[in-house]
Every structure is written in structure tokens, then in C-alpha cells.
């Protein structure tokens, strides 16, 4: 009886600790609240190359030979035969402009971000924009699709199961350890972040106008300044010549 109670107590403590840990470290995955098993990758290929459609954080769409966190997509059905494609990592919707170029957008537009899905006889799927009449394609050639004609290159896709480990979808939010010079003054009271003034030598003229002998004083009896020069050299020593050197001025 005592052993059973101890085991129950240990089980309760472990449950409480696990809940506390989960609350202290929240799930930062972009897949939180979504169905992990529904992630797919749209694969397209030609006789030479193959790609997976991926949506980057800046909205750029291109192809990658291997599955990445940016090629993981969520395809959801809207109307009958219409689907919406969303990047699992970037939360951007796959959209198309009037020229047939595809891009990732944070804002959903039913006219530009909804596609009609058709399955061809070879088992591949094509995604047609009902407004612009272009197929979703990773190729450069863009032309309006007409039923019964061959689709353009890199426009036929296969939905592949996700093989990217779940751990790769977890991103650590970077912490800011530096400050900017534009921060308020109370954050930098010693003005460490502000740029210091640069010292540049500014030429200073060392020439002086000799006093006139008519003014009286020491210059009347020593017009050439011989006695005054001697007293200056005796008082200042070798530093007398350094007084005429230009000092750097901070500009």
C-alpha cells in the first residue's frame, strides 16, 4: 500500500514538473496549431533537373533540389476544385500577378491567391489562376494555359510527403545585445555610442608683429628682442620653439 502511494506521488510530481517546463519554454514553432501530417512539398522536374517549390521570408519564390523548411507547404481546399497554398515556415500565401509571376504574400487575396487544381493523365497536378489564366510554374516562360496543350516546363507538380525533421522548424528568436546611437540619451548617459570628434591639425600662424620702439617699454631699449628672447629661452628652455607648433583642433 505504501509503495503504491509513493508511485502515485512520484507520477503526480513528474506531471507537474513537465507542465511547468512546457509553460516556461513555450512552443515557438510556426507549425503550432497546424496539422503536422498535412505538410507537403510540390515537386516538379524535367528530363535534366528537378525542384521543390519554396517560399522565402521576403516573398521570393524559387525552386530547390531538396526539401527545405521553406518548401514545406500547406494546401487547403477552399471551393470545389480550388486550393490555397501557404508556406508553413513563412506563413505567406502563394499568389500570382497579372503577368503570371508567382510570389509569397502575407495578405490573402481571393483573386490572386486561389488556384484551381487539376490532375493530369500522367498523375501530375497543375494549378491554374482563374483570374490570370496562367499556371503556377517555376520556369521563366509564361503563357496563358489552354486545355489540350502541353503545359510549360516546371508547371506539373507532385505532392510529396514532408521529410524535413520537425526540429528544423523551430527557430530561436535572436536577442539584441547591442545598442544604437539613435537610442534615447537615458540609455547612453556617458555618450559611449555617439561618434567621437576627429582631431585634424589646423595650421596656426606663428608670426607676430614686432612692437614699435615709439610705444616705450622694453621694446624701446631692445628693438630686436634679443634680451626678451634670452629670457624666454632661459625660462622655457627647449620648449620655447614648441609654442609655435600648431595644435590639433577638434572639428
Curated annotation (Swiss-Prot):
Record's function text: Regulator of phosphate homeostasis. Inhibits renal tubular phosphate transport by reducing SLC34A1 levels. Acts directly on the parathyroid to decrease PTH secretion. Regulator of vitamin-D metabolism. Negatively regulates osteoblasts differentiation and matrix mineralization. Up-regulates EGR1 expression in the presence of KL.
Disulfide bridges in this chain: 95-113
Name the record gives this protein: Fibroblast growth factor 23
One GO term of the biological process aspect: positive regulation of ERK1 and ERK2 cascade
Organism this protein belongs to: Mus musculus (Mouse)
GO CC list: extracellular space
Skewed-composition ranges (Basic and acidic residues): 179-189
Family affiliation: Belongs to the heparin-binding growth factors family.
PROSITE patterns (alphabetical): HBGF_FGF
PTM field: Following secretion this protein is inactivated by cleavage into a N-terminal fragment and a C-terminal fragment. The processing is effected by proprotein convertases. O-glycosylated at Thr-171 and Thr-178 by GALNT3 and glycosylation of Thr-178 requires previous glycosylation at Thr171. Glycosylation is necessary for secretion; it blocks processing by proprotein convertases when the O-glycan is alpha 2,6-sialylated. Competition between proprotein convertase cleavage and block of cleavage by O-glycosylation determines the level of secreted active FGF23.
Glycosylation sites: 171, 178
Predominant localisation class: secreted
Amino acid at each position: 500500500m505504501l509503495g503504491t502511494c509513493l508511485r502515485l506521488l512520484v507520477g503526480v510530481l513528474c506531471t507537474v514538473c513537465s507542465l511547468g517546463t512546457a509553460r516556461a519554454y513555450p512552443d515557438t514553432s510556426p507549425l503550432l496549431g497546424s496539422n503536422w501530417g498535412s505538410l507537403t512539398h510540390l515537386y516538379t522536374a524535367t528530363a535534366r533537373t528537378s525542384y521543390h517549390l519554396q517560399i522565402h521570408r521576403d516573398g521570393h519564390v524559387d525552386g530547390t533540389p531538396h526539401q527545405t523548411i521553406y518548401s514545406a507547404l500547406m494546401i487547403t481546399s477552399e471551393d470545389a476544385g480550388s486550393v490555397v497554398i501557404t508556406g508553413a515556415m513563412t506563413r505567406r500565401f502563394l499568389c500570382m500577378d497579372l503577368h503570371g509571376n508567382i510570389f509569397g504574400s502575407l495578405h490573402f487575396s481571393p483573386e490572386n491567391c486561389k488556384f484551381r487544381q487539376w490532375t493530369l493523365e500522367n498523375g501530375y497536378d497543375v494549378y491554374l489562376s482563374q483570374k490570370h489564366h496562367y499556371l503556377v510554374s517555376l520556369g521563366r516562360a509564361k503563357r496563358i494555359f489552354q486545355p489540350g496543350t502541353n503545359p510549360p516546363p516546371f508547371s506539373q507538380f507532385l505532392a510529396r510527403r514532408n521529410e524535413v525533421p520537425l526540429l528544423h522548424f523551430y527557430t530561436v528568436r535572436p536577442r539584441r545585445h547591442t545598442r544604437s546611437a539613435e537610442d534615447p540619451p537615458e540609455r547612453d548617459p556617458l555618450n559611449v555610442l555617439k561618434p567621437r570628434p576627429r582631431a585634424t591639425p589646423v595650421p596656426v600662424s606663428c608670426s607676430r608683429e614686432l612692437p614699435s620702439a615709439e610705444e616705450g617699454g622694453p621694446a624701446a631699449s631692445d628693438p630686436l628682442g634679443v634680451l626678451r628672447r634670452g629670457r624666454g629661452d632661459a625660462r622655457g628652455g627647449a620648449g620655447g620653439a614648441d609654442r609655435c607648433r600648431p595644435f590639433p583642433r577638434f572639428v
